[in-house]
Each structure stands twice: as C-alpha cells, then as structure tokens.
From Swiss-Prot:
Composed of three domains: a modulating N-terminal domain, a DNA-binding domain and a C-terminal ligand-binding domain. Residues 1-37 are annotated as: Disordered. Zn(2+) 2 binds at C97, C103, C113, C116. It comes from Hippoglossus hippoglossus (Atlantic halibut). GO terms for biological process: cell differentiation; negative regulation of transcription by RNA polymerase II; positive regulation of transcription by RNA polymerase II; retinoic acid receptor signaling pathway; thyroid hormone receptor signaling pathway. It is found in: Nucleus. Keywords: DNA-binding, Metal-binding, Nucleus, Receptor, Transcription, Transcription regulation, Zinc, Zinc-finger. Residues 1-58 are annotated as: Modulating. The gene is thra. This is Thyroid hormone receptor alpha. Residues 1-13 have a biased composition (Polar residues).
C-alpha cells in the first residue's frame, strides 16, 4: 500500500541516490556475507505481515525502529523512502557495489551502499509493484478523499436516521400548542386574501422628534396603536391555552407575558412577510412597508423585524413550528422577578425537546436547520429588548393618551 507520510528517517540522507565518497578499497568488517543470501534482484521472500506493530519492532531491512507496514514489509521511514524513490525514478540500474554486492545492511551502514540496500529491500519482500508513479499517487489520493467524503455523507445520513422524533406525550404537547396558536392567530392561512394595505400617504406626514434622535409620524403611530390591543390580547389568549402555563403563579404569568409579548407579535408579523409587496402584515389585517413601520414609532426595530421576515421566508415554517417557537419565547426563565425558575425551566425544556423532535420529524432540507432556527429565537429576544428601549424614548416625547391602556400595561416597567 502506498504510504501517505513524507517523514524522513533521522539516519537517512537526501543523498541516497547520489554518488558516495570513495572508501578504502578493502573489504570492510561487515562485508562478509553469503552470496546465496544476497541473490539476484528477482528473488522474493514473503514479507512479514503482522496484525499490529509491537513496541520497538525493528525494520526488516536495516534494523532501525519500524514505523509501519510499507510495500508489504515492516520498515522504517528511511528504507520506505529509499525504496519508493528508487522505483519511482528507476535508479536501481545505476546502483553499484564496490564490495561484490556483499555489504551487510544495518542502521549504520545502510547509506553506504545503495545496491546492497536495494537488494536487501527486495530480498525481505518489499514489492516494487506497490510503488505508484506520480499520476497514480494523485489518483489514489483523490480516491481516498472521495471515499472519506462518501463516509461522511453516509454517517450524516445515519445520524439523521437515528434522530429522535416526538413520542406520544410530546405529540400531545405539540397538538395543544398548535391549536393554541391557530385559535389566536388572526385570519389564519387566509391573511393574504384579507389583508389591507396601509395607504402610501401614511408614514409620510409631519414628524415629531424623539429623545433617541428618531422621528415619529403621529398619523402612522395612531394607525398602529389601533391594532395593538387585539394583537396583545391574542398573545395573552395563546399563553392561557398552553399546557403548563396556567399552572404557574399569577405573578410569574404576568412577568412572562410582559417579557415575550413584543417578541411573539414580531414573530407573527415576520412569518407574514411578503417579498412581492415587501410588506409585513400586522395582526393578520394591516400590510405595512418598512418605512411606514419605522416612521410609525418602531424606528430601528422595524428594520430588525423586516430582516427577520426575509430570513424566515427560507425556513418555510408551518403553524406548529411557529407555535412551538412562541412557547419557547414565552417560557423564558431569565425574565427578571420570576419566582418559579425551576418549574419554568422545565416547561421550556419540554417545549424545546418537543420542538427539536418535531423538526427531526419534518426533515427539512436546509443544513443545520435546528441550530439556525434557534438563532432566530435569539434574534427575537433582541427585538424585544430594542423595543423596550424604544418605548421609553417614545413615552418621553408622546402623550400617554396616544398609547392604548393595555399597551401601557404590558410595556411599562420593562427591563431594558
């Protein structure tokens, strides 16, 4: 087998194929050998084929420490490289020995006679036919790489096949979350047919400056506040229909709802992004453009929601996936002031597991679908935090009378 290592033996030399300095013309002490044992190059002795390398196992050519099974024999890196270069460059016809081809080859003398070293390689069983030329080496490495990639793909398929799907209890949790979403999601799947586009004139009127440097079109702001109360009410109704939420203390329920309300409303708007008209549909009824939403009070938060909508379009989420994402947002145990942290963590863990197993069941074609989708949860948390900051600035510049009571109740006193 052609080795992949290019490591050189510490006692080998790049001059293995070059001429060697003259030595005294007398037989060396180690030159006595049996001519029979060093017969013609065609002599082949079966190579030693161990199942594994034992500690300090010697090279069968020179006795140095072997590094592996090379060209059908256990050899060191030096003899492996010498044999490979000799065959690849067809150097052996030019090799000669000054001592009648009877040199003993060991760790010390191996570089002193190329012919005897090569004859020793052949005599112990190193196979010339296993040495590949450059084109075959490239082809072999390409084949190895292709096989490696093939194994990776097969392993990925096996991994996908063993990913757990929802069990009976999780299917029930999924069903109830999906029902909760469908019963509280305005217009359902017919939102495109029932939406009404906000007039282009709205969002282009006189602007009132805010303390954060942005400006607000009060006419657009008024339009948006009209749909805020029913939108917030639907989020509350969704939470009440969710398994486990009603079992939490009332104080914790209120904290969780205040924390997730903008996040869930943003998600519901983002999944109704229409690339053709470049609009988001709010509360299932009002289609708005980016600038209208921005000038109507959301400022930079508008950009974040529109960008999320564009990003989510490729995920092709169904009602169940949207419902489970909302449940995960709702059951966030890091909201300030919660008392039942452990129970809320357990609730979120249950929804996360059901969510992940449902994703496995759906078998999306997008690579790394699950971690990418979880990143969208992080994006929604950021949108919620940005909106809390934006609301503080709006409240400074705009009269409280402009805000619906439920809007104030939910978004006042939020952490920024």
């Amino acid at each position: 087998m052609e080795p992949m290592s290019n490591k050189q033996d510490s006692n080998s030399s790049e001059g293995d194929e070059k001429g060697w300095p003259d030595v005294p013309k007398r037989k060396r002490k180690n030159s006595q050998c049996s001519m029979k044992s060093m017969s013609a190059l065609s002599v082949s002795v079966p190579g030693y084929i161990p199942s594994y390398l034992e500690k300090d196992e010697p090279c069968v050519v020179c006795g140095d420490k072997a590094t592996g099974y090379h060209y059908r024999c256990i050899t060191c890196e030096g003899c492996k490289g010498f044999f490979r270069r000799t065959i690849q460059k067809n150097l052996h016809p030019a090799y000669s020995c000054k001592y009648e081809g009877c040199c003993i080859i060991d760790k010390i003398t191996r570089n002193q006679c190329q012919l005897c070293r090569f004859k020793k390689c052949i005599s112990v069983g190193m196979a010339m036919d296993l040495v590949l030329d450059d084109s075959k080496r490239v082809a072999k490495r390409r084949l190895i790489e292709e096989n490696r990639e093939k194994r990776k793909r097969e392993e990925m398929v096996r991994t996908l096949q063993v990913r757990p799907e929802p069990d009976t209890a999780e299917w029930e949790l999924i069903r109830m979350a999906t029902d909760a979403h469908r019963h509280t999601n305005a217009q359902g799947s017919s939102w495109k047919q029932k939406r009404k586009f906000l007039s282009d004139d709205i969002g282009q009127g006189p602007m009132v400056p805010t303390s954060d440097g942005d400006k607000v079109d009060l006419e657009a702001f008024s339009e948006f506040t009209k749909i805020m109360t029913p939108a917030i009410t639907r989020v509350v109704d969704f939470a009440k229909k969710l398994p486990m939420f009603s079992e939490l203390p009332c104080e914790d329920q209120i904290i969780l709802l205040k924390g997730c309300c903008m996040e869930i409303m943003s998600l519901r708007a983002a999944v109704r992004y229409d690339p053709e008209s470049e609009t988001l549909t709010l509360n299932g009824e009002m289609a708005v453009k980016r600038e209208q939403l921005k000038n109507g009070g959301l400022g930079v938060v508008s950009d974040a929601i529109f960008d999320l909508g564009k990003s989510l379009a490729q995920f092709n989420l169904d009602d169940t996936e949207v419902a489970l994402m909302q449940a995960v947002l709702l059951m966030s145990s890091d909201r300030s002031g919660l008392t039942s942290l452990e129970k809320i963590e357990q609730c979120q863990e249950a929804y996360l597991l059901a969510f992940e197993h449902y994703i496995n069941y759906r078998k999306h074609n997008i690579p790394h679908f699950w971690p990418k989708l979880l990143m969208k949860v992080t994006d929604l948390r950021m949108i919620g935090a940005c909106h809390a900051s934006r609301f503080l600035h709006m409240k400074v510049e705009c009269s409280s009378e402009l805000f619906p009571p439920l809007f104030l109740e939910v978004f006042e006193d939020q952490e920024v």
